[in-house]
Amino acid sequence: MMTPETLASLAAIAFASCWTPGPNNAMLASSGATFGLARTLPHLMGVALGFPVMAVIVGLFLGEAFQRSTLLQEGLRWGGAVLLLWVAWKIATAGGMGRAGSAPRPLRAHEAAAFQWINAKAWVMAIGTAAQFVRAEAPVTSALWIGGVFVVAGITSALGWAAGGAALGRFLATPARLAAFNRLMAAMIALGVVYMLAG
């Protein structure tokens, strides 16, 4: 069982890391603006539930192995960078076609959940929280607490970013405005990749 102080610390980290800009939030905002909140819900749930599942698994099994393997770290770093740049390109080139129905469909829940495993920010969050909050005397309980807190933080932040994008979608109803917004979201992802590679 976590102490109230430890739980408060975990919650602060979870909410701060889930609400700050990153690939998931940029993709959710872009999807909300392009497809609307209702069509973005599967994507939203994939992110909100996919990361906590990942965090529990990392907390129980993978965190220590990942911390010890430079090859795994570099593989994720560069593989994740390439994939995130591809995602940024797809968002940037989606332009303003979403309202006309010719844009690609929003992500499905299982696709958004799978994306967490190649998202560098997700790995940093999962390993960091595992290192700080998984206790050797109660690893399963600790990992489940981490997962539970991230479910709450993830649902609220994913909903906030997708709803924000959907609200902006009304303003972005013209193809030129939507294209500009999608390019801005793509630029946020690309800048995050540059920051990740520089760090």
Briefly describe each language-model feature range.
Residues 2-74, 128-146:
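Juxtamembrane transmembrane-helix termini in multi-pass membrane transport proteins
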Residues 5-6, 194-199:
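Juxtamembrane boundary at the C-terminal end of a transmembrane helix
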Residues 15, 19, 52-53, 89, ...:
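Hydrophobic/aromatic residues within the transmembrane alpha-helices of Major Facilitator Superfamily
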Residues 38-108, 164, 171, 194:
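Membrane helix-loop-helix hairpins that form the core translocation module of multi-pass transporters
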Residues 48, 52, 56-57, 124, ...:
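Hydrophobic/small/kink-forming positions within alpha-helical transmembrane segments
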Residues 115-126:
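Selected transmembrane alpha-helices and immediately adjacent juxtamembrane segments
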Residues 163-187:
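Interfacial loop-to-transmembrane junctions
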